A protein has these predicted regions:
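C-terminal beta-signal and terminal closure region of outer-membrane beta-barrel proteins
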Residues: 23-31, 77-107, 186-194, 198-200, ...
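Repeated loop/turn-to-beta-strand initiation elements of outer-membrane beta-barrel proteins
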Residues: 4, 46, 148-153, 240-241
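Outer-membrane beta-barrel and related beta-rich outer-membrane complex signature
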Residues: 7-12, 58-77, 161-187, 259-269
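Flexible, solvent-exposed coil segments and beta strand-coil junctions
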Residues: 10-21, 115-124, 204-217, 271-277
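Conserved small-residue
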Residues: 24-30, 34, 41-132, 172, ...
Length: 299
């Protein structure tokens, strides 16, 4: 375990100071975790072998201290209806979101216009949606060799964390998504027994502009995913052209497919490199699947 102390963060400055922001020492964040790696190599015959390696890591954190003048915590990121907030006793990356207001029976409320009612953005009204960071990361590499052929692949996985589909929210809010179109064709949308006009529902709960107070709870997904990260298939041409040189040719494929994911986008997406915006899809380019050829000549 380790403690990270005196991290610098930008917070709003008092109005009378004439400044927009000031920097503070945020306090003390305690990290606890472990990592281990285990490997195995087996030569089954003179021509066939297998090697494997598994890497596993776990990390959790807790905010032990914050500066005294932040009674509502430190907001790292505020986008529309979601905030990443640091609170004493909480965790780095805790996500709080606006949500549909409901009655005592769990049914969504609507105003006199027939629009769903979305909560405010004060700490008392926001709903805790989970933590943005995955607690468990895993990678598993395997290599098989038979005579001059080789096959290797890497499977990696992340367990836990949250991602936000802001692209999805915007398309809903603008009324151009598949689901909003289907709702219009169906004459409305029913949510937990309450029927809404499709346009009124999605314009309110979706993100019709990037600062609108939409119901982010509808667009938060589990970031858990397991993917085939890389596959390499190669062959070694020995004593090439009788010159005593070997040429290894390998076909490489990366980001081939997911074995499992809950989010409609790649959970590794990020809206930028700043604090609190990892795991946010904001019209990001789709993750590419790539193929390549590698040639290696040994003298």
């Amino acid at each position: 375990s380790s403690d990270l102390k005196n991290q610098f963060f930008s917070v709003a400055a008092p109005y009378e100071s004439g400044l927009r922001n000031r920097y503070v020492n945020a306090g003390n964040v305690e990290n606890k975790g472990f990592e281990f790696s285990i490997g195995w190599y087996e030569q089954f015959t003179d021509h066939f072998s297998w090697s494997t390696n598994l890497n596993f890591s776990y990390n959790d954190n807790k905010i032990k201290e914050l500066v005294d003048d932040l009674p509502n915590g430190l907001t790292l990121t505020d986008f529309g209806g979601a905030k990443v907030i640091l609170k004493e006793g909480g965790h780095y990356g805790d996500l709080y979101v606006r949500h549909l207001m409901r009655d005592e029976n769990g049914k969504p409320l609507q105003n006199e216009k027939g629009e769903p009612i979305v909560s405010g953005d004060s700490m008392d009204e926001l709903e805790y949606a989970g933590n943005m960071n995955a607690k468990v990361n895993m990678g598993w590499t395997n290599t098989f060799r038979y005579k001059d052929f080789s096959l290797s692949f890497l499977i990696d996985a992340k367990f836990g964390g949250k991602v936000i589909g802001m692209t999805e929210a915007a398309l809903d809010g603008w009324g151009v998504s598949k689901r909003s179109g289907e709702a219009r064709d169906a004459g409305g949308i029913t949510v937990d027994g309450v029927k809404f006009d499709a346009d009124k529902y999605y314009r309110t709960t979706g993100n019709n502009n990037f600062n609108s107070p939409y119901a982010v709870e509808n667009y938060v997904y589990d970031a858990t995913n397991i993917r085939l990260r890389e596959v390499t298939f190669g062959y070694t041409f020995r004593n090439l052209l009788g010159a005593g040189k070997n040429l290894t040719a390998a076909i490489i494929g990366r980001n081939l497919f997911f074995f499992h994911k809950d989010a409609p986008m790649d959970p590794d997406v990020s809206a930028g490199t700043g604090n609190g915006i990892q795991g946010v899809d904001m019209f990001a380019l789709p993750t590419s699947r790539s193929f390549g050829l590698n040639l290696k000549l040994n003298f």
